[in-house]
C-alpha cells in the first residue's frame, strides 16, 4: 500500500508518540545516514556555513527526509566531485511514530470495515517534529562552493512539504566580495 499524502501528517495536532519500548512493529527509518561529505573535517575548517531552515511548525516523514537528503547530497557530489571538500549534516531524527486507521474500499467494504470502532490505527512510519526556525540541514563548504550548496538546498526543499529558507549563517561577507 502506498504512503498517504503528506498533508495527513504534516500538522502537529496530537501529543508526541515516541515511546518505542511500548510500541511493536515500527518500520525502520528510511534515512540511511546523517553525515555526508568529508567526515574527518571539522566544521571550523570551512569558511562558509549554509543551513536550510523551516518557516513553520511541521512534521516531516522519514521518506521525505531521505529524499531531500539524497537530492542535496547528489547535487553536491555532481558539482564538487566524489572527493569534494564539504561537510553536510541532517540535523533531525524521525522519532515521532505515525499511525493510520486503514479503511477498506470497494465492493462489500461496509461488511468488512469497522469504521471508527477501535480506530487507534496501525503504525505506518515515523516522522521528525520540527519547530519554526529550526535547521533541518547544514552544509559547511568553501566560498567557491557556496552556489552549489544553495542549489543543493533548493532541490532539497522541493522534496519536503513546509516552506523553507536558505540562510548563510557564516561567511556571508566572503560571498558578497
UniProtKB/Swiss-Prot annotation:
- What molecular function does GO assign, one term? structural constituent of ribosome
Presence of keyword Methyltransferase:
no
- Record gene name: rpl10e
Q: Which GO terms describe its biological process?
A: translation
- Write the protein's name: Large ribosomal subunit protein uL16
The UniProt entry's sequence similarity note says: Belongs to the universal ribosomal protein uL16 family.
At the top level, the lineage of the source is Archaea
Q: Is DNA repair one of the keywords?
A: no
Keywords, A to Z, come to: Ribonucleoprotein, Ribosomal protein
Q: Name one GO cellular component term.
A: ribonucleoprotein complex
One family from Pfam that matches here is: Ribosomal_L16
